[in-house]
Each structure stands twice: as structure tokens, then as C-alpha cells.
UniProtKB/Swiss-Prot annotation:
Belongs to the 2Fe2S plant-type ferredoxin family. Signal peptide: none annotated. Its cofactor is [2Fe-2S] cluster. Keywords: 2Fe-2S, Chloroplast, Electron transport, Iron, Iron-sulfur, Metal-binding, Plastid, Transport. This is Ferredoxin. InterPro entries: 2Fe-2S_ferredoxin-like_sf, 2Fe-2S_ferredoxin-type, 2Fe2S_fd_BS, Beta-grasp_dom_sf, Fd_pln. SUPFAM superfamilies: 2Fe-2S ferredoxin-like.
Amino acid sequence: FKVTLDTPDGKKSFECPGDSYILDKAEEEGLELPYSCRAGSCSSCAGKVLTGSIDQSDQAFLDDDQGGDGYCLTCVTYPTSDVTIKTHCESEL
């Protein structure tokens, strides 16, 4: 799937298979994104899905309202379609 990250430095796109976490693939592509636990139990890597769909069933931090509003934790989020995610969203939670 094509993943586009809307970062403070501009938009960056890369291919990410449906079985790879978006944060891991972004790092392989040389992108520096915020993270801390890498286990879906904090909010350092939070992003917001602008278009497309994801699977973040491995996360345990965001509540249903935050997930329903489109927020995700990029360290435990898989793409399930082409997706655009705004990064650096921890302060919005």
C-alpha cells in the first residue's frame, strides 16, 4: 500500500506492506518520526488518519473516541489501503 505521511517537514510517501507497521517502514525509508515505547502503550507516535484505512488492533492506549476520531499509534498500525496520516499529533490527544 502507498503510505503518505503529512509531517511538519512536508509530505513523504513510501510503500508499506499490509503486514508491516507504518513506523517501522518509515524508519527503513529514513524518516525520523517521534516514538517512545514502540508497543502501542503510550502516545509519542500518535498520528491522525486523513484518508484510507488502517488496522491498529495491537494498540492499548487510545480510547474508542480517539480511535473513532481517526487517531492512531504509528508503531502498531498496519495499512489496509492506501493511506494518508498526519504525524506529530500527540499534543492533540
